[in-house]
Amino acid sequence: MRGYLVAIFLSAVFLYYVLHCILWGTNVYWAAPVEMKRRNKIQPCLSKPAFASLLRFHQFHPFLCAADFRKIASLYGSDKFDLPYGMRTSAEYFRLALSKLQSCDLFDEFDNIPCKKCVVVGNGGVLKNKTLGEKIDSYDVIIRMNNGPVLGHEEEVGRRTTFRLFYPESVFSDPIHNDPNTTVILTAFKPHDLRWLLELLMGDKINTNGFWKKPALNLIYKPYQIRILDPFIIRTAAYELLHFPKVFPKNQKPKHPTTGIIAITLAFYICHEVHLAGFKYNFSDLKSPLHYYGNATMSLMNKNAYHNVTAEQLFLKDIIEKNLVINLTQD
């Protein structure tokens, strides 16, 4: 009798395995069923990307949606962390801001290119005189960040932008920088960031308290262009890629990933191949340009107390040397 039950159990296990292979395909880059059902916008590839080992979950939908953001937060643990790594004490701010947005889609409905090749364009001074504009424009997806301009720098950084990450203190306020084909992504570091977006979308007076510098007082983007980044992406960057401690000593300011590292993490979740440009800093010369635009020098980055630039540079060096990404501005 016992042998009979064991045979039934083993048969059931084998049947489950066979069905699993049929449904998901052992050679297809796996995506969680809930994500595939939710947003079938990331085309699966027949091979894993070079950086697959860095991620616990794959093809995670990076933008929050009004209809199910609480469910997704509970599923991936974002309800257990505060901003910028979760929404434990800010869920109502998220709900209100999301209710004013028109879409949480990843790509255009007509975009069916599988296995996307992406470039993440940093704002580093290393881009000066590199004439990478045409090369950058050739990628399927181009991710930029903050107020790194395209206008006037097309030869160096290209013309196209698929996604642009921003926060209230770093967003463009001059309409000449608005490309209607660009999707802009709010990276919320604090509840004030969500309140700021809500006030702009509702046409209310902007409360500028609680920001490290004066935020934009007008929004040059239309609601259809705006998305809110899932804090899970920022948490992945901090804890799994940069290995930041979850609790910093009392005598230290907590460190958070830069927008650049967050942008790379986003690319890992939506792209099959990731290239980088503009992520190299020249710390040996503090008078060298910090950005490919403007007059800021490296001395500003050296004084930054909110980011661990050393940890980020070591991470970038590691993924480049292991060929997990390709660096277009490698000297």
From Swiss-Prot:
Q: Name one Pfam family in it.
A: Glyco_transf_29
Q: Where in the cell is it found?
A: Golgi apparatus membrane
Q: Which parts of the sequence lie on the Cytoplasmic side of the lipid bilayer?
A: 1-4
Record-annotated disulphide pairs: none
UniProt-listed Enzyme Commission number(s): 2.4.3.6
Taken from the UniProt entry, a GO cellular component term is:
Golgi membrane
EC class of the enzyme, as a word:
transferase
> Which residue ranges run through the membrane?
5-25
Can you state which reaction this protein catalyses?
a neolactoside nLc4Cer(d18:1(4E)) + CMP-N-acetyl-beta-neuraminate = a neolactoside IV(3)-alpha-NeuAc-nLc4Cer(d18:1(4E)) + CMP + H(+); a beta-D-galactosyl-(1->4)-N-acetyl-beta-D-glucosaminyl derivative + CMP-N-acetyl-beta-neuraminate = an N-acetyl-alpha-neuraminyl-(2->3)-beta-D-galactosyl-(1->4)-N-acetyl-beta-D-glucosaminyl derivative + CMP + H(+); a neolactoside nLc6Cer(d18:1(4E)) + CMP-N-acetyl-beta-neuraminate = a neolactoside VI(3)-alpha-NeuNAc-nLc6Cer(d18:1(4E)) + CMP + H(+)
Membrane topology, record value: Single-pass type II membrane protein
**UniProt cross-references to InterPro entries, sorted A to Z:** Glyco_trans_29, Glycosyltransferase_29, GT29-like_sf, Sialyl_trans
Q: Which UniProt keywords apply?
A: Glycoprotein, Glycosyltransferase, Golgi apparatus, Membrane, Signal-anchor, Transferase, Transmembrane, Transmembrane helix
Which BP terms in the Gene Ontology apply to this protein?
cellular response to interleukin-6; glycolipid biosynthetic process; protein glycosylation
**Care to name a GO molecular-function term for this sequence?**
N-acetyllactosaminide alpha-2,3-sialyltransferase activity
Similarity annotation: Belongs to the glycosyltransferase 29 family.
Give a short account of what the protein does. Transfers the sialyl residue from CMP-N-acetyl-beta-neuraminate to the terminal galactose residue on sugar chains of glycoproteins and glycolipids. It's alpha-2,3-sialyltransferase activity is specific toward type II glycan chains (Galbeta1-4GlcNAc) on glycoproteins and glycolipids such as neolactosides nLc4Cer and nLc6Cer, whose sialyl-products serve as precursors for the Lewis X antigen. Critically involved in the synthesis of functional selectin ligands needed for neutrophil recruitment during inflammation and lymphocyte homing to the lymph nodes.
Q: What is this protein called?
A: Type 2 lactosamine alpha-2,3-sialyltransferase
According to its UniProt entry, this protein's organism is Pongo abelii
